[in-house]
């Protein structure tokens, strides 16, 4: 996460210019050549997505590429390119059903105002749920973030757009004004979300943990509790500021 998230709050996603229609716009009715998808075409597309998920669930040292997906799906590259322009587009299609579960998995926990007396419990519940979401989808989400860190614009936008609902709900929990995305409370939400994402990134990165010789479940628990405490303090502090009119 970065200052871009602050700037994106309350704005619509900018469309990326493409030479061909994206898979997202042609998902159910046409392939990328404009041909209407029949049952066979839909089955082929589903095979590609299933093959991608199989590779993501496999050994972490196996590189994920379009050619690897084509082999896994027993398809030629020409057939695969009928459905996806590139690896980014394919991964965005895989991410779509995953992110559709975000509301039930963790976002919904923020929609009801948290009582002051139980801020700590609610904060820990959110951090734990978000961590659980990452555990379920770790390799895919790590891959998205690595691509975003490498300045892949579509993955950067996906990462920001995935965080925005949580950030805006954090602003509401802090009694902030959603119409003022440049306000300090939005910056606090950005900082809290950045910390939350970083904590779950570190605690679900087995390569990093092995490199640090620290695959310690208790250590992960301490980190999650520390992040929950920061979230609690941030919300409590800004509620007090809002109540005092500052």
Range-by-range predicted roles:
Residues 56, 91-98, 144, 148, ...:
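Alpha-helical DNA-contacting segments of helix-turn-helix folds
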Residues 1-31, 168-176, 190, 194-246:
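C-terminal peripheral helix-coil segments that are non-catalytic and often amphipathic
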Residues 47, 51, 55-89, 93:
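Helix-turn-helix
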Residues 65, 141-145, 156-157, 212, ...:
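Short, hydrophobic secondary-structure boundary micro-motifs
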Residues 37, 44-51, 188:
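N-terminal positioning helix adjacent to the helix-turn-helix/winged-helix DNA-binding module
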